[in-house]
Amino acid sequence: MSDNNQLQQIAHLRREYTKGGLRRRDLPAEPLTLFERWLGQACDARLADPTAMVVATVDDKGQPYQRIVLLKHYDEKGLVFYTNLGSRKAHQIEHNPRISLLFPWHMLERQVMVTGKAERLSTLEVVRYFHSRPRDSQIGAWVSKQSSRISARGILESKFLELKQKFQQGEVPLPSFWGGFRVSIEQMEFWQGGEHRLHDRFLYQRDDGAWKIDRLAP
């Protein structure tokens, strides 16, 4: 059982948010403009893994699952990440492409949430990115049958050494089970911490091809 003192400490952990607010007059017309600005500030602040995002999917029973992956590209078409196509998230996206992304930039007292539909990337896009990765990462993609049960880490390490020897000459080929997804932007919400828990939230939502902006209560 949990220690009562620790539980009491958790209940009282809090702080004020003091890094400034977000005002309607300061918002650009396009959400990606603000996203790019915030992402740049997260990088400039030297946050650990500023491109890390939570990817939320659901299975065929409606059970949600979350995991952290790295954003690898973004433009007006959507946000891109790569993964093993045999993974749980890939199977869940195949069943239900509606997913949610979250960028938790805690040190800046900010969050960005994206909702939309995921679609598979073209083979050309995947090949280009795959061969831009470090060689050991390319080999690592071959090693793991993601989300499958294994008895020990040594199995992965042995397989890695075996494949490193196998692919010693020439390019590492793209695994047929490795690919990526682009998440279209249907909604993008920006959250900025505020004093007295009066946080600022703004929601960008598509409306007849244009972006509608609404302030949301915290």
Swiss-Prot record:
Organism expressing this protein natively: Salmonella typhi
Cofactor section: FMN
GO biological process, one term: pyridoxine biosynthetic process
Role, per record: Catalyzes the oxidation of either pyridoxine 5'-phosphate (PNP) or pyridoxamine 5'-phosphate (PMP) into pyridoxal 5'-phosphate (PLP).
Disulfide bonds: none
Recorded metabolic or biological pathway in which this protein acts: Cofactor metabolism; pyridoxal 5'-phosphate salvage; pyridoxal 5'-phosphate from pyridoxamine 5'-phosphate: step 1/1; Cofactor metabolism; pyridoxal 5'-phosphate salvage; pyridoxal 5'-phosphate from pyridoxine 5'-phosphate: step 1/1
EC code(s) of this entry: 1.4.3.5
Family: Belongs to the pyridoxamine 5'-phosphate oxidase family.
InterPro entries, A to Z: Pyridox_Oxase (IPR000659), Pyridox_Oxase_CS (IPR019740), Pyridox_Oxase_N (IPR011576), Pyridoxamine_oxidase_dimer_C (IPR019576), Split_barrel_FMN-bd (IPR012349)
This protein's UniProt keywords: Flavoprotein, FMN, Oxidoreductase, Pyridoxine biosynthesis
Binding site for FMN: 67-72, 82-83, 88-89, 111, 146-147, 191, 201
PROSITE patterns attached to this UniProt entry: PYRIDOX_OXIDASE
Protein's UniProt keywords contain Oxidoreductase: yes
Protein name in the entry: Pyridoxine/pyridoxamine 5'-phosphate oxidase
Catalytic activity entry: pyridoxamine 5'-phosphate + O2 + H2O = pyridoxal 5'-phosphate + H2O2 + NH4(+); pyridoxine 5'-phosphate + O2 = pyridoxal 5'-phosphate + H2O2
Description of how the protein assembles with itself and partners: Homodimer.
